């Protein structure tokens, strides 16, 4: 068994009890129906399954595709049953998805699996009363990487061509938790046990020193696919992250460059580290999850801006709301304002000659 597999499996096993006890009303939790192990791709039925969570009785459901983490080599939807219930209790139809793990399934095959999962959900929309105009994605760690690459698959034909499959639906919003958004940076970082190099080897079948020769290197950098069409996104991250340090900051810079509407929460303590919101308790976890609830509620209500448009003060100390104006918008707004009206009146009076 590989070191990287041991590490990421241990994280799930050790944290399982805590991560799967979200703060839920007991009656709501009992009302949630779970349909497990639905196969969405018969060609890889050993791994391509999802669990569906919902509370019966709604006419239409917002839809969430949740993608677990695990360093690309480990993880399972069963370890994300808590967060799936947490979202389902909000009236959302949640699809908690498994996908092919490396090295059995080399990248980008797992990404193609996830596009197929999206398409299965699209095909089930009528039967399950899903509102695909309120379809969003979320994931933690490697799951956040895949979530951001699904957005790239929605927005770029060349990504679809690489995968051999195109999404049938558009992603309307995203919640990204402590993700990886630039593998090129990660392979050059120094990490304990060389965990990044080991994961890259499982992910691609190559050594990290050979990254430039990797056939699919263009699909390893989600930040490269940020553009004006990127959906509103909540980015949650830890400034002391031992696995994905500096990754969210790079994504946010890309958002700023393209005027993407985003909100973010950053923990600043070492204790609130990688994927801290899944721990539920503690100042940072509670604040991040409160912001997530607010963000998702506004998304469902249709109250999130499609693009960044203006600067507002932060709602609380942990949340950074980015709504920047473009230079063009600034010029337009200035053009509409009267410039020094009193001075203009004085100049007009001086040039006015008395009639004879």
Sequence positions of predicted segments:
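Non-Sec secretion/translocation targeting segments of pathogen effectors
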Residues: 353-356
């Amino acid at each position: 068994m590989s070191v990287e597999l041991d590490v990421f499996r241990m994280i799930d096993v050790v944290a399982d009890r805590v991560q799967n006890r979200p703060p839920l009303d007991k009656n709501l939790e009992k009302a949630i129906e779970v349909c497990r192990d639905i196969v969405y791709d018969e060609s890889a039925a050993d791994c391509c399954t999802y669990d569906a969570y919902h509370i019966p009785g709604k006419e239409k459901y917002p839809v969430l595709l949740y993608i677990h983490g695990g360093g690309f080599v480990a993880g399972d939807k069963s370890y994300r049953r808590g967060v799936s219930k947490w979202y389902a209790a909000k009236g959302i139809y949640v699809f908690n998805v498994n996908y092919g793990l490396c090295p059995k399934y080399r990248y980008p095959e797992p990404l193609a699996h996830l596009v197929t999962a999206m398409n299965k959900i699209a095909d089930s929309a009528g039967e399950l009363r899903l509102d695909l105009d309120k379809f969003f994605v979320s994931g933690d760690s490697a799951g956040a990487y895949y979530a951001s690459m699904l957005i790239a698959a929605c927005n770029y034909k060349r990504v679809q061509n690489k995968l051999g499959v195109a999404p049938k639906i558009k992603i309307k919003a995203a919640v990204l938790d402590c993700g990886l958004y630039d593998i090129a940076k990660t392979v050059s970082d120094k990490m304990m046990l060389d965990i990044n190099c080991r994961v890259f080897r499982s992910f691609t079948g190559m050594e990290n020193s050979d990254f430039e020769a990797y056939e699919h290197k263009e699909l390893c950098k989600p930040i490269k696919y940020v553009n004006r069409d990127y959906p509103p996104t909540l980015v949650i991250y830890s400034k002391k992250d031992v696995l994905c340090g500096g990754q969210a900051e790079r994504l946010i810079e890309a958002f700023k460059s393209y005027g993407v509407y985003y909100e973010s929460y950053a923990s600043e303590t070492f204790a609130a580290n990688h994927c801290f919101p899944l721990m539920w308790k503690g100042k940072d976890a509670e604040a991040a999850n409160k912001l997530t609830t607010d963000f998702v509620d506004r998304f469902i209500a249709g109250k999130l801006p499609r693009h960044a448009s203006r600067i507002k003060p932060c709602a609380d100390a942990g949340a950074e709301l980015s709504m920047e104006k473009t230079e063009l918008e600034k010029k337009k707004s200035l053009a509409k304002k009267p410039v020094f009206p009193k001075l203009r009146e004085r100049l007009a009076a001086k040039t006015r000659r008395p009639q004879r």
